[in-house]
Amino acid sequence: MIRILFMGALLMALFSACAGAGRVVSTAGTQPPVITRSYAADKGGYGQTWKIYIEAEDPDGDMVKITSELQQEGVRYQKPVDTIFVKKRDQKYLKGYLALDTFFLREPSFSVSSRLALRVSITDRAGNESKTAVFNFEYTGRTSESTSLPAPFDQGDIPKLGNIVIEGKYPPPRSD
C-alpha cells in the first residue's frame, strides 16, 4: 500500500513538472531592429575582402541574426544567403563589419557581370526584421586605395561581426 501511494505521488510530481515545462516566458519584443548607419566601398579589385560596415540597435535588445543575400548577374549561387548570429553582448546595439572575400565569388567575364549587390537585414528573436540595406560593388580590376571611413566607423577598432560565406554555381562554358 505504501508502495502504491509512493508511486502515485511520484507520478503526480512527474506529470506536474512536465505540464509546466511547456510554458516558456518569451523575452522577444515587438519592435524590429533598426540599421542606423551603414557603409561599404562601391569599387574594388577581384580577390580583395569587401568590408560591409553596419551600426544597428534594437529597442527590445533581442537581435539574433544578420542575413546577407548576394546577387550577381550571370551567376546562380547554390547558397546565395548567409546568416551570422549576433553575440549576446551585441543584441541591443552593434557596430562592426561583415567580411566578404570576393576571391571565392565568380570572377567577372563576358558571361558574368562585374557588379554585385548585397542585401543585409537583421532579425530579432520574435522574427521582426529591419529594413534591408543594399550595397553595390563593382570590380575595377585593381584593389581600391584605402579611403577614410565615415563616422562612426572611423572611431577606434571596429570589430568583425562575421564572415559572409556564399557558395557559387557558375554557368557552364560556352560551346561556340
Segments (PLM) and residue ranges:
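Short glycine/proline/serine/threonine-rich loop/turn segments at secondary-structure transition edges
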Residues: 104-115
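Aromatic sugar-binding surface patches on proteins
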Residues: 87-105
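Structural beta-strand segments of beta-rich domains
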Residues: 46-52
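C-terminal motif of bacterial Sec signal peptides marking the signal peptidase cleavage site
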Residues: 15-17
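Proline/serine/threonine-rich low-complexity linkers at boundaries of modular beta-sandwich domains
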Residues: 19-34
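Short beta-strand elements
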Residues: 128-174
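Extracellular acidic, Ser/Thr/Pro-rich low-complexity tracts
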Residues: 55-61, 124
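Short beta-strand segments of immunoglobulin-like
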Residues: 37-44
